[in-house]
Amino acid sequence: MSNQQPTAETIRRALRQNRDEPEGRARNAVAERLVAEAEATGDTPLLLQALFNLVNAYAYSSERDKFFVPFARLLRMWDERPGDFDGESAHHLHWIFKWVAGNMLDQPGIPLASIEKWQREMEHRYRLAGHSERAVHQGEFRIARHLGDTARAEAAHAAWLAADRDAMADCHACELHGQGSWQVDRGRDEEALRTWEPVLAGQYTCAHEPHNVLASSLLPLVRLGRLDEARAHHLRGYRLVRPMESMRGAVAGHVEFCALTGNEARALEILAEHPAYFTDTGDPDTLMDHLAVTGLLMRRLVALGHGDRSVPGPAGTDWTARALLAHAEREAAAVSARFDARNGNDAVSRRLRERLAAGPLVERLPLGVRARQRLTAPAAPAQPAPAAAAVPADREDVGALLAEARALSDAQHPDAGAAWAAAGRAAERTGTALGDPDRAEIADHAGIAAFTDPGTAVPLFDTAAELYEAAGKPGEAAACRVRAAYAKALAERTGRASAALDAALDALRELHDAGRATARQLTGAWLARLEVGPPGAGDEAELLRIIAFAEEHRDEERMAGRLADAITLHARHTAARGDVGACAGLFARAARLHHEAGTPWYAAEPEALLADLSLQRDDHATAEESARAALEHGATALGPVHRAHLHTVLAAALAARGADAEAADHALEGAHWADEGDMSEELGAWARLVLGGALLREGRAAESATVLETALPDLVRAHHDGRVVQARWWLGEALRDLDEPRAAAEQFLLAAEIAQDWEEQQDHAVLANLAADSLERAGLAGEAAQAYCRAGELWRAMERPVPLVRTLRARAWLTLHDGQGGLAEGRAAMAEAAAVAEEALAAATAAGDGAAAAHLRAELAGTHRQTGELIVRSCPGEPGEDDTDGSARAAYEEGLACAERAITIFGPGPARSAAQLMAAWLEADLGRHAAAAERARAVIAEYHGQDEGGDEGGDAGVAAQRLAEARSVLEYAGERPAGPERAEAGEA
């Protein structure tokens, strides 16, 4: 191993690389080594670079307490030899002054007197250097705010805003974060959010903004009821700060938000992702933040009954929520006590106590992301359906409760069972004796409630049957016996159970024939028998007999609903046979019958089935209409799983017609209710897939990526390949939009691996192309070339000339990268692209396909233009005195010839004018200024008057760009740009 001292250039290169490394101890260690190596060279400017790099590394890490040593050395070097500092390093030194007081405040071991002294030192040095006092007042404000001195803070804040901004002022984004945070402290949430708006909108950004603003905005948004924005800020913001070691305070804001919005499970996952945050002591202030929100979260878990649950905490110990609560509160209090002792007041510990004591802001704010384990009990539906009873009964008035229950039963309302149960409980509490009919109803409805547990349900049905018999209601008694046999038959699926059901049905049929049972009772029993039996050839005929019977008795009491039930079952059987067109009409008729019967809540079932079927048939309008109707009519009758399914179907239908904002809302609801129904892996993953796609199309890539990343494990485990491919495709696009091309390429390639086995290869080819594009953006030219080759082979096999031509051109450009073949291979790829386009153009022309021919003509022309660009860009020099061998002139002449070929092939429009301007620049570089000017004036004449109005991306925007470039060509060629009046006079 060589011990040779690295050269200065090697160290400079290493410093550049070190600045781009992830924050943390590893980067700091390299920065420390580079200082030693730079010092050994004796090169003072290089040593200054290394020291500044070390200061930055410490400042943006968990070792902020080490910041002061290299800074003190820099300051000493400045005081001793200011001439060693050039303008940039002098600026950097004064810039870092601002950090010192803030870093001192965060270290309780540094006396307050030293901090105040440093603040005066900063003011003195800034004055000597001629800088504005804006940064000084900002430092004064930070000290006062930390100390809880409101009057001093308000005065410093006002002075800060009044002072001029200069080169030493904090960046706009950081300033606005501090100003908004103060407004939150003062209880002015809306004002804070207005202050932060330019940062949130991307007008002002920096290395740590909008990261901090997104975290700080969470609780103000929730307090103001702006829950959708809060959710979006969490999904977007946590993604930004998760990999950054220095953002412990912002991460704490996300944990706090989750703890106070019913997302405790999500908060636990965030804690688990940052175990070092419990032990990194270099920044006591953010350590206290982390401990405080950990304590807050543990308090919530204990309050929810999860005190003995295992939770992530400091390494080396198995923690329960209760134990971590005690630890976090104790350690946070110890840190705050150190601050209080330093500051001479209890401002820090008071803020800590207030933070720990915070209560939930909302019961549950669905985030759309998958929590690996739920902690809270399932929530009730948000909007229960109105009960049929006009006036709620007194809970101890048995007579009123019975009347309410009868009214609900007469209305066939789904709340009838609960009403009978309430009446029964009230009778027991008050010792009220009930008659046989009421006791029968109570037992009957209790059996229905326990239907899936035959051991409980059957005795209740038997009791109800006896009571109905005693009350002189033989039809109801027989119907109860059918229900008992039905419950057993469904659970056991045995011949004996089916025989018992047959016997009960026969008994009920005899009663109906004798006029002692209703058609409704018989129809219900008949349908039950058909549902229990194994599918058979006679089912269709039997169903038609039931429907005919129900139609015959349709005018009898409550028979419209029974007819609807029969038609719904018929529709299910029809769908199973594959006749989806017929069953759609049957579901629609069943829903209408329920509405005619005045029982819209029962229409929810056929409406839901119709919605599902319509979505499968790509009938998105019917799917949307039916899902909305089912959600409206289902009300309390819908459980979490059915509610989740309907919201997701509705979301998918809305997304299919481009209503992505509303689709995202319903997909979010679908994911939430799937979680409540313990269906996260199945239904929840589908909802999150729909949500991720809708968010992506809405331009919310960070939220989309976060949602899709949490959905993918479930999709891979429990869903078909089509959904997995779609999820990875959308995730790849989201990551691409977030400028994470390497990660995007990984998703595209994983999706392509699945799609390669499909019979239809279109998706495989597109995914290979997308992967290649992302690999190229990531600087992985070799891998990109392989992916483009893969895509090209697929396009060729599918006889798709347009994407094949584009893939060949992309491969050609890659050849200019080191190790990728160079210009000769690039020319060959462009020539192949031109040949493919020419052959396809000839075929389209011969076939009389004008649209295809026009498209291919544009691709051929574009290939010629790009060939010229490739040749010119690969040329190391330009025509002129330095072009001693004439190679540059030859390359530019060839590039011009390619551009002229493109101009002759392109039709009128932006593509041809772009080629014309390319030719103009080349003419100018070749010294043919008159020819260049002539081309430029032709473009000006073409676009004269078209650059007014419209947006930047429209025709007016293109016209403005072309006119501006043409005038630049004229200036470059040494001519005055022609104004409108000269163009009109014929000078163009």
Predicted regions and their residues:
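Amphipathic alpha-helical segments of tetratricopeptide repeats
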Residues: 32-39, 72-83, 119-127, 157-165, ...
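TPR-repeat structural position
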Residues: 24, 44, 64, 150, ...
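Structural motif corresponding to the intra-repeat A-B loop/turn of tetratricopeptide repeats
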Residues: 21, 41, 61, 109, ...
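C-terminal non-catalytic interaction modules
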Residues: 278-425, 429-437, 742, 869, ...
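Residue register of alpha-helical TPR repeats
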Residues: 9-12, 49, 89-96, 134-138, ...
